[in-house]
Amino acid sequence: MNWRRIVWLLALVTLPTLAEETPLQLVLRGAQHDQLYQLSSSGVTKVSALPDSLTTPLGSLWKLYVYAWLEDTHQPEQPYQCRGNSPEEVYCCQAGESITRDTALVRSCGLYFAPQRLHIGADVWGQYWQQRQAPAWLASLTTLKPETSVTVKSLLDSLATLPAQNKAQEVLLDVVLDEAKIGVASMLGSRVRVKTWSWFADDKQEIRQGGFAGWLTDGTPLWVTGSGTSKTVLTRYATVLNRVLPVPTQVASGQCVEVELFARYPLKKITAEKSTTAVNPGVLNGRYRVTFTNGNHITFVSHGETTLLSEKGKLKLQSHLDREEYVARVLDREAKSTPPEAAKAMTVAIRTFLQQNANREGDCLTIPDSSATQRVSASPATTGARTMTAWTQDLIYAGDPVHYHGSRATEGTLSWRQATAQAGQGERYDQILAFAYPDNSLSRWGAPRSTCQLLPKAKAWLAKKMPQWRRILQAETGYNEPDVFAVCRLVSGFPYTDRQQKRLFIRNFFTLQDRLDLTHEYLHLAFDGYPTGLDENYIETLTRQLLMD
């Protein structure tokens, strides 16, 4: 029996049955009172007010508070060097490598945040948190440890006022984007910015409990716990959390975008909507009618974000927008807010195009409203567009240049028409993006990087073999040759297939074993959606038949 078969059987053995399922607990801070939700894998089972007595172990959350202190007090970076001396380094880095603050928070590297290593004095720590009226457990370094039990209410209180939380929220988006948490970003988008935690359940060393705590994108504190590790909680309950967690519609990025409206069309005059008198240059508030020199006209609304300028006798309309409002307005102009999955994919493409193509002027990005770049609605974004944009706030698709078109579909260009069709077939936004941009990866605005280290020689070898194998494979029930896919280098662990992103992860491409791994993972993708695609014996037998034929 090969290792793939062993891993598959172990996974089946360890999966909990519905009868054994312990409800997931989710707490959201509300305007009037905090709400406690109990969730099963199929939905909400109970909602009640949060009892003051509900407690939680801190688990790994203590690291978030050290991170906040380091950021807020502007402590210099002190990288942790991995030397292979501690088993805890598995959460940090490989021997010979080092890890910095942001990455340590995402990976939950406790060795980095150890107060003794960072020379954090108990008096300095206590004074800092006492000045901020923090809970007693937070003001004492001796109680800042995983086993410390605190009330969930006090935890939410501390998160609501946590210093440097904007920076922490930005960095913690990488937790959701972790490629090992398959399906989480697909279901939750960028709505949660959380630090994961795991600990022992009720002091029973053999039973784990885990979850996460942090914020929604609008700053609402939340806390979650369930049976298993934080990773299993996230992956198992991502679908139901998607249905329960709200989507804020008024979210700002703090990044400004300056847009010259109607950049390619000379303006003749601007009037109030029900007037024929041209308005003077200045900030615009209200409904206006712009007339172009070609005789066409359009009505738009400004709430002070758009200014009429006159430069060398030529009129110019310039809007000063938050980045996420800009994305929503482009969605309104270039596409629609429905179907949702296509719209979500479009917002990521729009945001990525902006990052790749905008110029900078001071603190703002600058980009013209033009069919040569991106067309922008002159009026405020619709609620639907803002909702779709908020769902993917800060997400980009890092890697190769990104383009999109209304109807034309080519590699590197997302077709809106095709995206709507894919959404109609049940594909999620990340699958739509993966089809259009197979070599790119979901990433965040502040740290654009592709998680797929491409193996072009492996992909070229597979592309050459596919026509040769077609005669054999087309005779197999369930075979569906994938149109696009990527072959990526595996950083650690066993080779695997990310079916949603259509990515094959293998260690390298030098040996016969590498070719066996690549073929094996390709077959998992080619038989995706059919029972044989999950049959390790079938896939392994077919792999050897293809390579030994």
Curated annotation (Swiss-Prot):
Keywords in alphabetical order: Signal
Signal peptide: 1-19
Zinc is among the record's keywords: no
Keyword Ribonucleoprotein: no
Protein's name according to its UniProt entry: Uncharacterized protein YfaQ
Species this protein is from: Escherichia coli (strain K12)
